[in-house]
Amino acid sequence: MAFNLKGRSLLTLKEYTPQEIRYLLDIAKQVKAERKAGIVHQRFVGKTIALIFEKRSTRTRCAFETAFGEEGGHPVFLSTDDIQLGAKESIEDTARVLGRMFDAIEFRGFKQETVEILAKYAGVPVYNGLTDEYHPTQVLADLMTIEEEFGSLKGRKLVFVGDGRNNMANTLAIGCAKMGMHYVINSPKELWPSESFIKEIKDMAAENGGTFELTSVPGEGLEGADAIYTDVWASMGEEAKAEERERLLRPYQVNEEMMKKTGRDDTIFLHCLPAVKGQEVTFEVIEGKQSRVWDQAENRKHTIKAVLIATLL
């Protein structure tokens, strides 16, 4: 079923229905197949997108640039050293100006408030390429990767091990709840999300036939998991907390012993990257036969292209 998403922004995934997320994943599957078959389209000829980056990036920047450029569009990279975003010019005014010059805007940075303001004032679609709170384009790629592996999403079990209140844990919670999956956070209680967020996700999951659970016992809740997911212990901008996180999260390292706790040989390992091998995950796991991190990375491009197609055409 097709949906009219033209003009929509992508800020958290909360604003998209399960059916709309399904639609985006179906487009992503189509464009990936086209790419592999050598089929070339020029869907974005004459269109431009501003790519604003407060935080450095490999996958997000490359995915947006290639997804847009392959379709004949013109991406323009703007670091916050290059523009006046929130410095000599307000975010609101920057949004208004860029909205007159570009067909869309991507923002990757610290505050969720910034991307929300851009979306409110730009008058064109705005995409969250990562903030401290949410990372929706990554989770679309994660969902695509899980579906490629197992053929479906509903009823699948994903366990996030590590910092349970970071942007990945938050957005995976939304994505899993929307798609009727069973989501578990295995994390120290000090790093659990807020009570209000937990309630919101539990209600969302129940509405769609999924579940949301949390446990603080290292390695607990992994039984029967289709996928185990982790992320760096100290996110960008949290370098000062690295030593404290090391102390808290060392028991939560994803290693071969933890992977075996699922009781399955076909459980896959996921990571949004970049990874600190030997810290949150061992070399043996991330480089092993159960790892799908490189498929995830590739799928960033296909899912981002799907979002662009759905919201710009």
Curated annotation (Swiss-Prot):
An annotated GO BP: citrulline biosynthetic process
Subcellular location: Cytoplasm
UniProt superkingdom: Bacteria
Chief localisation class: cytoplasm
Pathway the protein contributes to: Amino-acid biosynthesis; L-arginine biosynthesis; L-arginine from L-ornithine and carbamoyl phosphate: step 1/3
PROSITE patterns linked: CARBAMOYLTRANSFERASE
Residues annotated as binding L-ornithine: 167, 231, 235-236
Family per record: Belongs to the aspartate/ornithine carbamoyltransferase superfamily. OTCase family.
Function: Reversibly catalyzes the transfer of the carbamoyl group from carbamoyl phosphate (CP) to the N(epsilon) atom of ornithine (ORN) to produce L-citrulline.
UniProt protein name: Ornithine carbamoyltransferase
Species assigned in the record: Caldanaerobacter subterraneus subsp. tengcongensis (strain DSM 15242 / JCM 11007 / NBRC 100824 / MB4) (Thermoanaerobacter tengcongensis)
Gene name tied to this protein: argF
